[in-house]
Amino acid sequence: VVLGRTLAVSLLGLAGHVIEVEAHLAASLPAFSLVGLPDASLAEARDRVRAAVTSSGLPWPNRRITVNLSPASLPKSGSGFDLAIAVATLAGAGLIDPAAARGVVHLGELGLDGRLRPVRGVLPAVAAAVAAGHRRVVVPAANAPEASLVPGAVVVGAHSLAQVAHAYGADIDAPDVVPVPSDHLDVARAAPDADLVDVLGQDEARMALEVAAAGGHHLLMVGPPGSGKTMLAARLPGLLPDLTEAEAVEVTAVHSIAGTFDPVGGLLRRPPFEDPHHTATPASIVGGGSGVPRPGAASRAHRGVLFMDEAPEFSTAVLQTLRQPLEHGELVIHRASGVARFPARFQLVLAANPCPCGRGVGKGLECTCRSEQRRRYFSKLSGPLLDRVDLQVDVLPVSRAALDPGSVAESSGIVAARVAAARAVQAERLAGTPWRTNAEVPGAWMRERLGPDRRLVSDLDRALDRGLLSLRGVDRVLRVAWTLADLAGRQGPRRDDIGQALLLRTRGQGLA
């Protein structure tokens, strides 16, 4: 009995599992069987592998071939197993050195001509292989720069199956081939090249944006068209600090699976920015798809900003899918074959008009909407969703005074410096805890540090008694108050900080 063995990696969400690929060749009627819980796309590998082997100048073994993907309990999908199946088959047939291929991880899709095509998710797959103790990895040449980002990985990039077989001792030539380029759908966007200095007026909205950046808070802006909501949202990523090394690896892994990562620039070190159209489906926001689940816009915005312009125009199903990541910081995709988890700890920015026609506030043309239309328009933004949004402000039309050439607004650099200082204070206060920003801190932890003086939170007590705030809303106001204190350089929030946080929570209404 001749066995060929090598390794591959199966991805489920961001979690990678090393798979042993075994090929058994028996002297029987020629056949090719693939076992070990492969899906339909992986079952097609039989024909691709056979065509690639013969196109590479190697003889196809005229025997009964059984390829096992172990452990069989793990689901396997996608074309990334092609190279490992081909190498195991050639090793079992004695066409290459079996010992050389054993213990090496092989990732890549095979074309019918034997060329290696790049696959998605190479970064988390290689990271999982290295974590399991398998440092040597063979990938398509187009994926080699991405695989090399994993510390400790010994990466070999190949253009064709013939090159891989030749390196393992096959008696064939390995001619140069035209490489298959990477197929990036749309390179992940970091902070847009925009500055707050371009935003005229809007002092309250600018302050809310600074507070959101400093504390990691979610933000709702309501205002007529042209008031600057989109401009403000696009400038939020520019106020956020760079990602840490661990965050950069995690964010890059998400975009690697999504196919939106260009490895030329290295790890993604700036917060990503996602702004899906209001016609987006729940699957495009949450993720999913056939075969290997792919992250949606919410996961691609991990450690960055998810901006939903014209939020009431999104379907109710889409808006309700946001509740899980807002509460838990991850998205869970349930399949019959397993559960895929993607991180989704983003800052949500919602923008909405005051009514369907958009002229509900300000001067000029009168609003043409009936009260029922207004109620139905905002009913999409449900109470449970808005209850999770810490900052809710009105963005009013800009006055003529804001257009005065002598009035100069602060730049993003100045505001970002204050944000960085506030984040440093939070990091010191939250050292030794699992939280990084005020927006993540539980209410009980904050209330303990306010002390027993109820006068400090008397405004919150009245708002709670009058039904203006839920208990979750009280905690959200306290989080914003701590952020205001951090921006001001104080050790803790004062009563005026809590009052201002309450105004920022209730679109300027406070206890009125």
Protein language model annotation of sequence segments:
Residues 35-46, 59-61, 68-78, 293, ...:
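Basic, amphipathic alpha-helical bundle interface domains used for macromolecular binding and assembly
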Residues 210, 266, 271-272, 283-306, ...:
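Conserved alpha-helical scaffold flanking the Walker A/P-loop in AAA+ ATPase domains
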Residues 1-220, 224-227, 334, 492-512:
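Peripheral, non-AAA+ core regions of ATP-driven protein-machinery
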Residues 113, 308-315, 358:
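Catalytic P-loop NTPase motifs of RecA-like helicase/translocase cores
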Residues 223, 287, 310:
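The Walker A (P-loop) glycine that initiates the GxxxxGKT/S ATP-binding motif of P-loop NTPases
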Residues 60-63, 100-101, 133, 151, ...:
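Short loop/turn elements that form and flank the Walker-type P-loop nucleotide-binding site
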Residues 221-262, 328:
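Walker A/P-loop
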